Amino acid sequence: MPFITEIKTFAALGSGVIGSGWVARALAHGLDVVAWDPAPGAEQALRKRVANAWPALEKQGLAPGASQDRLKFVATIEECVRNADFIQESAPERLDLKLDLHAKISAAAKPDAIIGSSTSGLLPSEFYESSTHPERCVVGHPFNPVYLLPLVEIVGGSRTSPEAIEAAKTIYTALGMRPLHVRKEVPGFIADRLLEALWREALHLVNDGVATTGEIDDAIRFGAGLRWSFMGTFLTYTLAGGDAGMRHFMSQFGPALKLPWTYLPAPELTDKLIDDVVSGTSEQQGERSIAALERYRDDTLLAVLEAVKSSKASHGLSFSD
């Protein structure tokens, strides 16, 4: 069955931080958006989040016809998905909830509409088990803020068709995203597994009194983080090998991997560790509100994205290279 890839109506189920990010991105790309969330006050909170994201999206550039007025909030799942060309679910990470939700979504949706889930911790084969037409169901795992960061990890379940993966790539690309197909259905996918390893080490460093949260963040943002934003890990280490490249790097520094520098198990989240982390991040935040920090993050991300795009273009590369 051919799947819909030219999207006019985008359905969003769940309107928290991630769901509202999808809504803002879809609206900015000139789509009609139908949203549903059963939580009290959800519509008001969603419209506020979209309004907060809009200045950054205006700076990035809106598609013709893009408007916050093209958002419609509805009372039922069926009304949300019935006429949608694409569906993105961003509900809480509970298997029982997602099983029930996707049974209802898939029963009411067009049979050729791709259904994506924003899950970061559940596997698609599990929560799409009771879905109608499971061959069109994928994970589309984004990163916050969804309306600015381009990466989306696409994961298929045991019954997802290859055609659905390709259709999802096309849809997410049209939304200005950089789709990354995760070849195997594994917990944590790709990016979160890397981030969790770094997070565990950071917690150990705080717990052992080696560094404060601010010092750890400085180690990233003034060091490797700058390189990671445009080269990633492997290409960075290729340069560390000199003219001989990665093979020399592996032979020279590979044995260091066996040194007992790092921990694999996470530290126990004691009250003291939690207090130390909260105290440290509160000091970093200072008098700035969360809203002010979000504006700072968005403006800086826009500048970084534009700088990376411009520099790549000068070297004959596209942004996604």
From Swiss-Prot:
Cross-referenced InterPro entries: 3-OHacyl-CoA_DH_NAD-bd, 3HC_DH_C, 6-PGluconate_DH-like_C_sf, 6PGD_dom2, L-carnitine_dehydrogenase, NAD(P)-bd_dom_sf
Q: Which reaction does it catalyse?
A: carnitine + NAD(+) = 3-dehydrocarnitine + NADH + H(+)
What pathway, per the record? Amine and polyamine metabolism; carnitine metabolism
Q: What is its EC number?
A: 1.1.1.108
Q: Sorted alphabetically, which keywords does the UniProt record give?
A: Cytoplasm, NAD, Oxidoreductase
Any one cellular component term from GO for this entry? cytoplasm
Q: Give a single Pfam family match.
A: 3HCDH_N
The UniProt record gives the binding positions of NAD(+) as G14, S15, G16, V17, I18, G19
SUPFAM superfamilies for the chain: 6-phosphogluconate dehydrogenase C-terminal domain-like, NAD(P)-binding Rossmann-fold domains
Question: Would you kindly state one Gene Ontology biological process term found in this protein's UniProt entry?
Answer: carnitine metabolic process
* Subunit record text: Homodimer.
- Chain's role: Catalyzes the NAD(+)-dependent oxidation of L-carnitine to 3-dehydrocarnitine.
Q: Which family, according to the similarity comment?
A: Belongs to the 3-hydroxyacyl-CoA dehydrogenase family. L-carnitine dehydrogenase subfamily.
Name of the protein in question = L-carnitine dehydrogenase
This protein's species is: Pseudomonas putida (strain ATCC 47054 / DSM 6125 / CFBP 8728 / NCIMB 11950 / KT2440)
